[in-house]
Amino acid sequence: MIQIDALPAFNDNYIWLLQDATSRRCAVVDPGDARPVEAWLAAHPDWRLSDILVTHHHHDHVGGVAALKELSGARVLGPANEKIPARDLALEDGERVEVLGLVFEIFHVPGHTLGHIAYYHAAQTPLLFCGDTLFAAGCGRLFEGTPAQMHRSLARLAALPANTRVYCTHEYTLSNLRFALAVEPENQALRERFEEATRLRERDRITLPSEISLELSTNPFLRVSENSVKKKADQRSGQQNRTPEEVFAVLRAWKDQF
Protein backbone atom coordinates (compact mmCIF):
# COMPACT_ATOMS: atom_id res chain seq x y z
CA MET A 1 0.00 0.00 0.00
CA ILE A 2 1.50 3.29 -1.13
CA GLN A 3 0.67 6.46 0.78
CA ILE A 4 0.83 9.74 -1.12
CA ASP A 5 1.27 13.09 0.61
CA ALA A 6 1.98 16.61 -0.60
CA LEU A 7 5.06 18.54 0.50
CA PRO A 8 4.40 22.27 -0.11
CA ALA A 9 7.15 24.21 -1.87
CA PHE A 10 7.55 27.83 -3.02
CA ASN A 11 4.25 29.72 -3.12
CA ASP A 12 1.96 27.13 -4.69
CA ASN A 13 3.94 24.02 -5.70
CA TYR A 14 3.39 20.54 -4.34
CA ILE A 15 6.10 17.89 -4.31
CA TRP A 16 4.29 14.55 -4.24
CA LEU A 17 5.78 12.09 -1.75
CA LEU A 18 5.06 8.40 -2.34
CA GLN A 19 5.75 6.17 0.66
CA ASP A 20 6.06 2.39 0.92
CA ALA A 21 5.89 1.65 4.66
CA THR A 22 6.86 -2.00 4.19
CA SER A 23 10.26 -1.26 2.66
CA ARG A 24 10.67 2.19 4.25
CA ARG A 25 11.40 3.57 0.80
CA CYS A 26 9.93 6.70 -0.72
CA ALA A 27 9.86 8.58 -4.01
CA VAL A 28 9.15 12.19 -4.92
CA VAL A 29 7.67 13.84 -7.99
CA ASP A 30 8.99 17.16 -9.33
CA PRO A 31 11.11 18.38 -6.39
CA GLY A 32 11.70 21.97 -7.43
CA ASP A 33 13.12 22.65 -3.97
CA ALA A 34 15.17 20.07 -2.08
CA ARG A 35 14.46 21.53 1.37
CA PRO A 36 10.95 20.14 2.01
CA VAL A 37 12.15 16.66 1.04
CA GLU A 38 15.32 16.99 3.10
CA ALA A 39 13.24 18.05 6.10
CA TRP A 40 10.93 15.05 5.71
CA LEU A 41 13.86 12.66 5.40
CA ALA A 42 15.51 14.19 8.48
CA ALA A 43 12.29 13.63 10.42
CA HIS A 44 12.11 10.03 9.15
CA PRO A 45 15.73 8.82 9.38
CA ASP A 46 14.81 5.17 8.83
CA TRP A 47 13.39 5.94 5.37
CA ARG A 48 15.33 6.02 2.12
CA LEU A 49 14.60 8.14 -0.94
CA SER A 50 14.87 5.66 -3.81
CA ASP A 51 13.42 7.52 -6.82
CA ILE A 52 12.93 11.04 -8.13
CA LEU A 53 10.32 11.38 -10.89
CA VAL A 54 10.44 14.45 -13.13
CA THR A 55 7.76 15.53 -15.61
CA HIS A 56 9.53 18.43 -17.34
CA HIS A 57 12.56 20.71 -17.18
CA HIS A 58 11.21 23.91 -15.58
CA HIS A 59 13.23 25.01 -12.56
CA ASP A 60 10.33 24.84 -10.10
CA HIS A 61 10.15 21.12 -10.91
CA VAL A 62 13.86 20.21 -11.07
CA GLY A 63 15.63 22.75 -8.84
CA GLY A 64 16.08 20.28 -5.99
CA VAL A 65 16.95 17.20 -8.03
CA ALA A 66 20.74 17.43 -7.96
CA ALA A 67 20.92 18.05 -4.20
CA LEU A 68 18.54 15.18 -3.44
CA LYS A 69 20.46 12.87 -5.75
CA GLU A 70 23.68 13.75 -3.95
CA LEU A 71 22.06 13.30 -0.54
CA SER A 72 20.35 9.98 -1.18
CA GLY A 73 21.72 8.39 -4.33
CA ALA A 74 18.14 8.16 -5.59
CA ARG A 75 17.47 7.16 -9.17
CA VAL A 76 16.37 10.15 -11.28
CA LEU A 77 13.74 9.52 -13.97
CA GLY A 78 12.73 12.12 -16.52
CA PRO A 79 11.72 12.87 -20.09
CA ALA A 80 14.21 11.78 -22.72
CA ASN A 81 13.77 14.91 -24.82
CA GLU A 82 14.51 17.50 -22.14
CA LYS A 83 17.58 18.41 -20.12
CA ILE A 84 17.01 17.01 -16.63
CA PRO A 85 19.68 17.35 -13.90
CA ALA A 86 21.38 14.11 -12.81
CA ARG A 87 18.98 12.00 -14.86
CA ASP A 88 19.63 8.25 -14.73
CA LEU A 89 16.72 7.00 -16.81
CA ALA A 90 15.49 8.84 -19.91
CA LEU A 91 11.84 7.98 -20.56
CA GLU A 92 9.94 7.86 -23.85
CA ASP A 93 6.24 7.59 -24.61
CA GLY A 94 4.87 4.11 -23.99
CA GLU A 95 7.71 2.92 -21.78
CA ARG A 96 6.99 1.34 -18.41
CA VAL A 97 8.98 1.81 -15.24
CA GLU A 98 8.62 0.35 -11.76
CA VAL A 99 8.73 2.65 -8.73
CA LEU A 100 8.11 1.35 -5.21
CA GLY A 101 6.54 -1.76 -6.71
CA LEU A 102 4.11 0.25 -8.86
CA VAL A 103 4.36 0.05 -12.64
CA PHE A 104 3.95 3.42 -14.36
CA GLU A 105 3.32 3.92 -18.06
CA ILE A 106 4.90 7.00 -19.59
CA PHE A 107 2.76 9.39 -21.63
CA HIS A 108 4.38 12.04 -23.80
CA VAL A 109 2.10 15.05 -23.31
CA PRO A 110 3.60 18.05 -25.15
CA GLY A 111 2.12 21.51 -24.79
CA HIS A 112 3.40 23.18 -21.63
CA THR A 113 6.86 22.05 -22.78
CA LEU A 114 7.70 19.97 -25.82
CA GLY A 115 9.15 17.02 -23.92
CA HIS A 116 6.70 16.96 -21.00
CA ILE A 117 5.74 13.49 -19.74
CA ALA A 118 3.16 12.10 -17.32
CA TYR A 119 3.33 8.97 -15.18
CA TYR A 120 0.24 6.73 -15.16
CA HIS A 121 -0.34 3.73 -12.89
CA ALA A 122 -3.27 1.53 -13.94
CA ALA A 123 -5.00 0.01 -10.92
CA GLN A 124 -8.42 -0.26 -9.27
CA THR A 125 -7.84 3.38 -8.40
CA PRO A 126 -5.48 4.63 -11.13
CA LEU A 127 -2.89 7.31 -10.42
CA LEU A 128 -1.73 10.09 -12.75
CA PHE A 129 1.19 12.41 -12.04
CA CYS A 130 0.87 14.99 -14.78
CA GLY A 131 3.06 17.95 -13.79
CA ASP A 132 1.86 21.11 -15.50
CA THR A 133 -0.26 19.54 -18.25
CA LEU A 134 -3.64 18.96 -16.61
CA PHE A 135 -4.48 21.10 -13.59
CA ALA A 136 -7.51 21.00 -11.32
CA ALA A 137 -10.05 22.90 -13.45
CA GLY A 138 -7.34 24.09 -15.83
CA CYS A 139 -4.23 23.32 -17.84
CA GLY A 140 -0.69 24.57 -18.15
CA ARG A 141 0.40 27.57 -20.16
CA LEU A 142 1.85 26.92 -23.60
CA PHE A 143 5.48 27.89 -23.10
CA GLU A 144 6.80 25.71 -25.93
CA GLY A 145 3.99 23.74 -27.56
CA THR A 146 1.01 24.65 -29.70
CA PRO A 147 -2.68 24.71 -28.79
CA ALA A 148 -3.20 21.65 -31.01
CA GLN A 149 -0.49 19.73 -29.15
CA MET A 150 -1.91 20.59 -25.74
CA HIS A 151 -5.44 19.75 -26.83
CA ARG A 152 -4.30 16.31 -27.97
CA SER A 153 -2.38 15.77 -24.73
CA LEU A 154 -5.39 16.72 -22.62
CA ALA A 155 -7.69 14.54 -24.72
CA ARG A 156 -5.41 11.61 -24.03
CA LEU A 157 -5.57 12.20 -20.29
CA ALA A 158 -9.32 12.82 -20.39
CA ALA A 159 -9.80 9.34 -21.87
CA LEU A 160 -8.33 7.66 -18.78
CA PRO A 161 -10.70 5.89 -16.36
CA ALA A 162 -13.09 8.29 -14.66
CA ASN A 163 -11.80 7.43 -11.18
CA THR A 164 -8.16 8.20 -12.04
CA ARG A 165 -6.69 10.37 -9.31
CA VAL A 166 -4.97 13.41 -10.79
CA TYR A 167 -1.84 14.67 -9.03
CA CYS A 168 -0.81 17.94 -10.64
CA THR A 169 1.88 20.17 -9.19
CA HIS A 170 0.30 23.55 -8.37
CA GLU A 171 -2.40 24.93 -6.09
CA TYR A 172 -4.07 26.89 -8.88
CA THR A 173 -7.53 25.47 -8.31
CA LEU A 174 -9.41 28.56 -7.13
CA SER A 175 -7.93 30.75 -9.85
CA ASN A 176 -8.77 28.12 -12.45
CA LEU A 177 -12.31 27.76 -11.14
CA ARG A 178 -12.90 31.51 -11.35
CA PHE A 179 -11.98 31.35 -15.02
CA ALA A 180 -14.10 28.24 -15.54
CA LEU A 181 -17.10 30.09 -14.08
CA ALA A 182 -16.53 32.91 -16.54
CA VAL A 183 -16.78 30.31 -19.31
CA GLU A 184 -19.71 28.32 -17.89
CA PRO A 185 -21.52 30.41 -15.25
CA GLU A 186 -24.57 28.11 -15.32
CA ASN A 187 -22.60 24.90 -14.69
CA GLN A 188 -23.97 23.67 -11.34
CA ALA A 189 -21.20 21.12 -10.79
CA LEU A 190 -18.70 23.89 -11.34
CA ARG A 191 -20.38 26.21 -8.83
CA GLU A 192 -20.41 23.44 -6.24
CA ARG A 193 -16.76 22.70 -6.86
CA PHE A 194 -15.85 26.36 -6.43
CA GLU A 195 -17.68 26.48 -3.09
CA GLU A 196 -15.95 23.32 -1.87
CA ALA A 197 -12.50 24.51 -2.99
CA THR A 198 -13.10 27.85 -1.28
CA ARG A 199 -13.95 26.08 1.98
CA LEU A 200 -10.82 23.95 1.73
CA ARG A 201 -8.52 26.91 1.11
CA GLU A 202 -10.11 28.91 3.93
CA ARG A 203 -9.01 26.07 6.23
CA ASP A 204 -5.56 26.06 4.59
CA ARG A 205 -6.20 22.60 3.13
CA ILE A 206 -5.13 21.50 -0.32
CA THR A 207 -7.60 20.95 -3.15
CA LEU A 208 -5.71 18.04 -4.70
CA PRO A 209 -5.69 15.37 -5.95
CA SER A 210 -8.54 15.72 -8.40
CA GLU A 211 -10.24 13.00 -10.47
CA ILE A 212 -10.78 12.68 -14.19
CA SER A 213 -14.55 12.50 -13.66
CA LEU A 214 -14.49 15.84 -11.84
CA GLU A 215 -12.36 17.41 -14.54
CA LEU A 216 -14.72 16.22 -17.27
CA SER A 217 -17.63 17.97 -15.58
CA THR A 218 -15.89 21.21 -14.53
CA ASN A 219 -12.67 21.83 -16.48
CA PRO A 220 -13.37 24.04 -19.52
CA PHE A 221 -10.25 22.80 -21.30
CA LEU A 222 -11.69 19.28 -21.29
CA ARG A 223 -15.14 20.54 -22.28
CA VAL A 224 -14.30 22.25 -25.56
CA SER A 225 -16.87 20.11 -27.41
CA GLU A 226 -19.70 21.28 -25.14
CA ASN A 227 -22.07 23.76 -26.76
CA SER A 228 -21.93 26.09 -23.76
CA VAL A 229 -18.13 26.29 -23.95
CA LYS A 230 -18.05 26.69 -27.73
CA LYS A 231 -20.64 29.48 -27.55
CA LYS A 232 -18.55 31.41 -25.04
CA ALA A 233 -15.39 30.90 -27.11
CA ASP A 234 -17.21 32.15 -30.21
CA GLN A 235 -18.34 35.24 -28.33
CA ARG A 236 -14.83 35.84 -27.06
CA SER A 237 -13.18 35.50 -30.47
CA GLY A 238 -15.94 37.14 -32.50
CA GLN A 239 -16.06 34.25 -34.93
CA GLN A 240 -17.31 30.69 -35.30
CA ASN A 241 -14.71 28.23 -34.06
CA ARG A 242 -15.18 25.13 -36.16
CA THR A 243 -13.14 22.55 -34.24
CA PRO A 244 -12.48 21.67 -30.60
CA GLU A 245 -8.84 22.61 -31.20
CA GLU A 246 -9.90 26.13 -32.21
CA VAL A 247 -12.15 26.42 -29.16
CA PHE A 248 -9.26 25.30 -26.97
CA ALA A 249 -6.92 27.89 -28.51
CA VAL A 250 -9.42 30.68 -27.77
CA LEU A 251 -9.86 29.53 -24.17
CA ARG A 252 -6.12 29.25 -23.57
CA ALA A 253 -5.44 32.73 -24.93
CA TRP A 254 -8.31 34.10 -22.82
CA LYS A 255 -7.01 32.40 -19.67
CA ASP A 256 -3.54 33.88 -20.26
CA GLN A 257 -5.10 37.34 -19.91
CA PHE A 258 -7.72 36.52 -17.28
Curated annotation (Swiss-Prot):
It holds the Pfam family HAGH_C. Thiolesterase that catalyzes the hydrolysis of S-D-lactoyl-glutathione to form glutathione and D-lactic acid. Binds 2 Zn(2+) ions per subunit. It catalyses: an S-(2-hydroxyacyl)glutathione + H2O = a 2-hydroxy carboxylate + glutathione + H(+). This is Hydroxyacylglutathione hydrolase. InterPro entries: Clx_II_MBL (IPR035680), Glyoxalase_II_hydrolase (IPR050110), HAGH_C (IPR032282), Hydroxyacylglutathione_Hdrlase (IPR017782), Metallo-B-lactamas (IPR001279), RibonucZ/Hydroxyglut_hydro (IPR036866). It is an enzyme of class 3 (hydrolase). Zn(2+) 1 binds at H56, H58, H112, D132. Its cofactor is Zn(2+). GO terms for molecular function: hydroxyacylglutathione hydrolase activity; metal ion binding. Its EC number is 3.1.2.6. Belongs to the metallo-beta-lactamase superfamily. Glyoxalase II family. The keyword Metal-binding applies. Keywords: Hydrolase, Metal-binding, Zinc. The keyword Metal-binding applies. Pathway: Secondary metabolite metabolism; methylglyoxal degradation; (R)-lactate from methylglyoxal: step 2/2. Monomer. Gene3D superfamilies: Ribonuclease Z/Hydroxyacylglutathione hydrolase-like. GO terms for biological process: methylglyoxal catabolic process to D-lactate via S-lactoyl-glutathione. Zn(2+) 2 binds at D60, H61, D132, H170. It comes from the Bacteria.
